[in-house]
């Protein structure tokens, strides 16, 4: 008889399922508790109350769709808006900080994908503790940089509001008025969205692993 973890592996055809259960063929109480953890109403499972489609084909969750939209559409638009703001106003500090923060996000994702590929092939965890903390510093620094740049450019005397006010003083028939207001508003929205997006990425990366460490009481870098 073959053994695995001190449990005999028997042919399923030789097992009397009714005899293994309790009364009327029911499972023992301990097995019922074990199997209940796989139910769809588990409070601690994030997808427990998600609406599952009737078909059995794999589908993307809303988080995956939002990530793809942010990664492929939103962040490139932030880069374009920052570049247009620099080209129109000549102010380079805030656009450079926003562009650096967005590029840092892409670099960290590329590094995580590369480490995941290399370490999984070596049967290791994707991240080591030093790499995890290094990525936390990079992502947290990028988020802080984007926030400071957005706040400074928005509320400085010669910043975003100054350009909006100056644009509103132009004649309504002047085509530069609408162009200047559009670029300024788009750049302002892009800067604050970039700051919020960077902070969301940092907290999502850090808190998930911090919570896992607190639950398992062991450093698990994944």
UniProtKB/Swiss-Prot annotation:
- Its main subcellular localisation, reduced to a broad class, is virion
Localization (cell): Virion; Host cell membrane; Host endosome membrane; Host Golgi apparatus membrane
| Record's GO cellular component terms | host cell endosome membrane; host cell Golgi membrane; host cell nuclear membrane; host cell plasma membrane; membrane; virion component
Q: Give the residue spans that cross the bilayer.
A: 64-84, 98-118, 131-151, 182-202
Annotated membrane topology: Multi-pass membrane protein
What processes in GO biological process is this protein linked to?
viral life cycle
**KW Membrane (keyword) present:** yes
InterPro entries per UniProt: Herpes_UL20
Give yes or no: UniProt keyword Transmembrane helix. Answer: yes
Q: Provide the alphabetized UniProt keywords.
A: Host cell membrane, Host endosome, Host Golgi apparatus, Host membrane, Host nucleus, Membrane, Transmembrane, Transmembrane helix, Virion
| Purpose | Plays an essential role in egress of virus particles from the nucleus, cytoplasmic envelopment and virus-induced cell fusion. Forms a functional protein complex with gK and this interaction is absolutely essential for their coordinate intracellular transport, gK glycosylation, expression on host cell surface, and function. Together, they modulate gB-mediated virus-induced cell fusion and virion egress and therefore actively participate in these processes.
Query: What family does the Swiss-Prot or TrEMBL record give for this protein?
Result: Belongs to the alphaherpesvirinae UL20 family.
Subunit structure of this entry?
Answer: Interacts with gK (via N-terminus); this interaction plays a role in the coordinate transport of UL20 and gK to the trans-Golgi network (TGN), and is required for their cell surface expression. Interacts with gB.
Name by which UniProt lists this protein:
Protein UL20
């Amino acid at each position: 008889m073959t053994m695995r973890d001190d449990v005999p592996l028997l042919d399923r055809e030789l097992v009397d399922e009714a005899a293994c259960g309790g009364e009327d063929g029911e499972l023992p109480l301990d097995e019922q508790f074990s199997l209940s953890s796989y139910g769809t109403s588990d409070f601690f499972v994030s997808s427990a109350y998600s609406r599952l489609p009737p078909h059995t084909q794999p589908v993307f969750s809303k988080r995956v769709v939002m990530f793809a939209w942010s990664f492929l559409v939103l962040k490139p638009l932030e880069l374009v808006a920052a570049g247009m703001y620099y080209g129109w106003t000549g102010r380079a500090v805030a656009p450079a900080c926003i562009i650096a923060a967005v590029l840092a996000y892409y670099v960290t994702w590329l590094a995580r994908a590369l480490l995941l590929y290399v370490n999984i092939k070596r049967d290791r965890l994707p991240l080591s503790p030093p790499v995890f903390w290094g990525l936390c510093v990079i992502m947290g620094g990028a988020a802080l940089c984007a926030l400071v740049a957005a706040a400074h450019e928005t509320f400085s005397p010669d910043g975003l509001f100054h350009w909006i006010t100056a644009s509103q003083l132009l004649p309504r028939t002047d085509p530069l008025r609408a162009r200047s207001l559009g670029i300024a508003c788009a750049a302002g929205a892009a800067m604050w969205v970039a700051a919020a997006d960077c902070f969301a990425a940092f907290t999502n990366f850090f808190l998930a692993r911090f919570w896992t460490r607190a639950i398992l009481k062991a450093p698990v870098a994944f």
